């Protein structure tokens, strides 16, 4: 049997390194997540980072669980950022769930719909880069 905490820790580290490779931004695990509720899993050293990241690694499934999305929403609401769930199931690629509003803002628009976009990891990195660029230009 796999230790779920170790599996989560390893996935958070994998994502931390992948984000650095793609975006050049440093992330660290938020160790307070075990002591306090409504915190994300990874913290970015860049204060303009627009997301609270929740990482989930599970054996089977095909989409993010509602509880994960709610957890990310609560954490994001507390710090006025966009929620983001980065998840992976065995034998499937990493996927990322973000609000339509984040995608719209990255493309120069707005969106009030509560819908979520499910992106590839690289698609998410594109949106994050564009969103940070749009905000820096304001």
Report residues per predicted region:
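Catalytic phosphate/metal-binding cores of nucleic-acid and nucleotide-processing enzymes, i.e., regions
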Residues: 1-138
């Amino acid at each position: 049997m796999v230790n779920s905490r170790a599996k989560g820790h390893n996935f958070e580290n994998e994502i931390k390194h992948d984000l650095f490779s793609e975006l050049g931004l440093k992330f660290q695990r938020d160790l307070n997540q075990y002591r306090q509720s409504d915190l994300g899993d990874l913290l970015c050293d860049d204060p303009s980072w627009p997301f609270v990241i929740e990482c989930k690694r599970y054996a089977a499934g095909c989409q993010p669980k509602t509880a994960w999305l709610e957890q990310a929403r609560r954490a994001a609401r507390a710090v006025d950022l966009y929620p983001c769930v980065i998840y992976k199931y065995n034998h499937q690629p990493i996927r990322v769930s973000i609000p339509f509003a984040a995608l719209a803002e990255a493309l120069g628009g707005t969106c009030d719909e509560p819908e979520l976009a499910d992106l590839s990891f690289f698609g998410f990195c594109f949106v994050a880069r564009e969103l940070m660029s749009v905000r820096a230009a304001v």
